[in-house]
Amino acid sequence: MRFLNIFLFFAAIIAFATASQVFEEDEIDMEPRITCDLIGNERLCVLHCLAKGFRGGWCDGRKVCNCRR
């Protein structure tokens, strides 16, 4: 009985670990597009890009923030 419990414990850990790896590969990073719509327009876009490590950014005609490299 003890061997069965240990076996099931390790089988559950392995199943969980492999399921997590597959999920991370299929995950899409969706970010809301609110930096160009709120008060300050391009200021929030520039701050957003600076926080991500870029040199700045601007809002295009579709109100989408574009970061400079």
Swiss-Prot record:
Question: Domain remarks in the entry?
Answer: Has the structural arrangement of an alpha-helix connected to antiparallel beta-sheets by disulfide bonds (CS-alpha/beta).
Signal peptide boundaries: 1-19
List localization entries: Secreted
Q: What is the lineage of its organism?
A: Eukaryota, Metazoa, Ecdysozoa, Arthropoda, Hexapoda
Taken from the record, one Pfam family name reads Defensin_2
Q: What is the organism field in this record?
A: Dolopus genitalis
- Gene Ontology annotations of biological process type: defense response to Gram-positive bacterium; humoral immune response
Propeptide intervals in chain numbering = 20-33
Q: Which InterPro entries match?
A: Defensin_invertebrate/fungal, Scorpion_toxin-like_sf
Q: Which family does it belong to?
A: Belongs to the asilidin-12 family.
A further note on this protein reads: Is abundant in venom, since it accounts for 45.2% of precursor counts.
**One Gene Ontology cellular component:** extracellular space
Does the keyword Phosphoprotein belong to this entry? Answer: no
* Cited SUPFAM superfamilies: Scorpion toxin-like
Q: Which GO terms describe its molecular function?
A: potassium channel regulator activity; toxin activity
Q: What does this protein do?
A: Moderately increases Kv11.1/KCNH2/ERG1 currents and shifts the voltage-dependence of the channel activation to hyperpolarised potentials. In vivo, induces neurotoxic effects when injected into insects (tested on L.cuprina and A.domesticus).
State the tissue distribution.
Answer: Expressed by the venom gland.
Q: Which cysteines are joined by disulfide bonds?
A: C36-C59, C45-C65, C49-C67
> Can you say what this protein is called?
U-Asilidin(12)-Dg3a
Q: Which UniProt keywords apply?
A: Disulfide bond, Ion channel impairing toxin, Neurotoxin, Potassium channel impairing toxin, Secreted, Signal, Toxin, Voltage-gated potassium channel impairing toxin
